[in-house]
């Protein structure tokens, strides 16, 4: 077993160090996305890097706060800033419809709602076993507000902008790259006070698997709204059961069960993409 102090290296960094590191990473991302017309992968990596750096920088700002009342509002900045950034990107590129904000008449493959809803089985079981954690209306309201902004930011970034930026790649590659970046985006949780590296690694791994299913459904159904709704329901059940959706180290049985279920759903997602040319994705004609 390693030295406990070593596992707290990143969470224990001074807030200025976290803030500075985050700004440097975000600045590197800006350099990557400058030539927006050259290389979709570079643009996607740039968006990912900007988001990751911004989250780390804001974690530094939050860590610097004291016990003033406004400190409890600071976590909203953690997701509001990258959410506003990604909304600005969509507006600048006129991509809102292309990334899945489509009218109901353009939705496809409604039967894929079934595998999408299967992702909720584990959190439903967990919530049923633990029950709803007692809390106040104010705290729950703040948690739900944070959650909704966070879901918008994550889904629009990884099932929206990143997938669209990678259109030059095969559909399978687009989904896998997007899912991998989605998983890696959770590494900023290493900077949380008391962060468990094993829990963060587990969250990254499972997020990649979930991201495959979400990406496949997003492209096949030609809508991002349903994916956002299911993602929000997933995280809300974690909040109701545990009081938060932060990464924790799983038990071995829990890890095996979650991995088997999510791996099966990820494989199902990849099977969804094995369609004849012209029927896999409805984005091409929207360009």
Task: Locate each region found by the language model.
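Functionally important transmembrane alpha-helices
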Residues: 176, 199-259
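Juxtamembrane helix-entry segments on the extracytoplasmic side of multipass membrane proteins
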Residues: 8, 132-144, 191-206, 252
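Small-polar-interrupted transmembrane alpha-helices in polytopic inner-membrane proteins
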Residues: 147, 172-187
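Juxtamembrane "helix-exit" motif on the non-cytosolic side of transmembrane helices
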Residues: 2-3, 57-66, 124-133, 187-192, ...
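Short, strongly hydrophobic alpha-helical membrane anchors
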Residues: 1-12
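Alpha-helical transmembrane segments in multi-pass membrane proteins
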Residues: 10-21, 37-90, 112, 140-142, ...
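Membrane-interface helix/loop boundary segments of multi-pass membrane proteins
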Residues: 153-179, 219-223
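C-terminal membrane module of polytopic membrane proteins
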Residues: 24-29, 230-287
